[in-house]
Amino acid sequence: MFFSLEQFRKAWPKQGWSWDYRFSMVASSFHVDLIPDAERALLLAFPESYDPKGFARAPEHIRELGESVGGIRADQRMFAGPAVGRLVPIGLWWPWGDEITISLRVGLAGYVGEHDLRRLQMNFNALG
């Protein structure tokens, strides 16, 4: 799983990730002009995508995480990779509402330990 996240990070159109302490995820903001490149990169680690309409049929652990961050609203999407053991990679696509900026947060669902979060931070060079 961390290998696919590494491939994703290398393909991501923006450099630089920060640590989002609210959600214990790495975050990157980008301009809407980069949407095609961002979507291509997401496919490397996150083959499943859920919008507000399809969120109800997402697996339970995906719905639980989505609800823990306030739900999935219009224009937002949630991405998931395949489960590896006790972990599932997750992406949250959140437009800012200014029509030009989107944030992507990448995190882990499942039975996540401190060492898993630390490894995520290190892999994305988002040490906080």
Task: Outline where the language-model segments fall.
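A cross-family detector of function-defining hotspots
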Residues: 1-128
